[in-house]
């Protein structure tokens, strides 16, 4: 796969709470240099990224209701509107995870719809088509819940489903930490559920070319990673990614 093709899949990400302005500027410089799909940053950095990326073709992505998804739907909608007014092109929202676990899927869908509706309205005002990605936090959900939440996202009019925030801390019955990021199994399940024309984003724990390839081959068409520059710089263009136009 050519580096240019690789870059088109990557959301170059910096969401740590202690990230500084210098790091965000560097993130944008790397995204411009390598022509990544977007930078994904916390809402407070959206305006800065808009300025840094002006004219580059790189999108500005931010997060909504992040990382817990536990604020109200109105809070998420308002946050979405402000983010788009500040320059966001894409928003990655976290579902109400508690509602999903409780099988209150009307609440899950209504919550997603609130963000989608706000994004469409705000996008129309600023003259941009806004992409909405729905973070499921798959480490907390059974396969059946993942399937149902994917269908909620489709019905609500979103554009992508996404695996993880990367900030969850699941534990087993003995209190031992469990994996919290993307898995090939979950990506494959999500792709089969939403079909070929809907977006699937893998995020959380993707720090190597090997893991990135695994996610693409499982069905992801967007990758969220803070290691995008390292992966790009060390990429071997002779690599064949199955199921992709290399």
Give residue ranges: language-model regions.
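Alpha/beta enzyme core
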Residues: 3-34, 46-200, 208-233, 241-246
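N-terminal low-complexity or amphipathic/hydrophobic leaders
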Residues: 38-45
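Conserved P-loop NTPase nucleotide-binding/switch module
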Residues: 237
């Amino acid at each position: 796969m050519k580096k240019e093709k690789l870059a088109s899949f990557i959301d170059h990400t910096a969401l740590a709470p202690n990230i500084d302005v210098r790091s965000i500027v560097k993130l944008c410089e790397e995204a411009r240099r390598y022509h990544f799909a977007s930078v994904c940053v916390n809402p407070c950095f959206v305006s800065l990224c808009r300025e840094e990326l002006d004219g580059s073709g790189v999108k500005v992505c931010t997060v909504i209701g992040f990382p817990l998804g536990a604020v109200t739907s109105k809070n998420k909608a308002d946050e979405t509107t402000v983010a788009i007014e500040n320059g966001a092109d894409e928003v990655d929202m976290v579902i109400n995870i508690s509602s999903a676990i409780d099988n209150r899927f009307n609440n899950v869908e209504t919550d997603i719809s609130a963000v989608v509706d706000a994004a469409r309205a705000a996008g129309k005002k600023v003259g941009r088509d806004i992409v909405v990605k729905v973070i499921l936090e798959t480490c907390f959900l059974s396969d059946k819940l993942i399937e149902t939440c994917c269908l909620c996202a489709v019905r609500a009019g979103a554009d992508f489903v996404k695996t993880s925030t990367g900030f969850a801390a699941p534990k087993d019955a003995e209190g031992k930490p469990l994996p919290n990021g993307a898995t090939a199994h979950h990506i494959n399940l999500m792709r089969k559920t939403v079909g070929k024309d809907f977006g699937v984003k893998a995020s959380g724990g993707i720090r190597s070319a090997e893991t990135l390839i695994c996610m693409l081959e499982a069905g992801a068409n967007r990758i969220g990673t803070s290691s995008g520059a390292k992966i790009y710089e060390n990429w071997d263009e002779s690599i064949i990614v199955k199921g992709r136009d290399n």
